Amino acid sequence: MGCTSKSEGVAFVQAVLTKTGSVDAKNVIVDTSNYARHFEKWLKVFSRDQFLIVKEEEISRTPFKVIREAEEFLDVPGFFREDMFVFENDKKRYCFKSTRREINSSCPLMYPPSVPKPEISEEVVHKLRDFYRPHNRRFEELTGMNFSWSNL
């Protein structure tokens, strides 16, 4: 029997919750998404102006603008052009296209067909949101930015 949304959800919940049902802050999946904790470590080594924080929704809406901003931030010559991005209606997002043979057009699937999106109960989602909320607010303070997902 292959992976199903339900089996993936069960495996995810077993990984991120303790036996008592609380969020396991030490679990690698949970810890990886604690952006504030990781960013605070980086800020001990680098100044805030050495970071470019990019919102996923901006990449989705205006990929060329975001890439141009990254090129300027890195002080590298502009390589990308607006015509290198095409909106794919079936995927509902922009994809990279190239006329060069060695670079294949790229628009990966969000979830590959072989990996079903996990089915997670509202109770677990609520626990995770409650756990991350203070960390997400701290990340907003550290970055000086607002994120759509920080107050869910």
Residue spans of the language-model regions?
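Anion-recognition interface
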Residues: 1-152
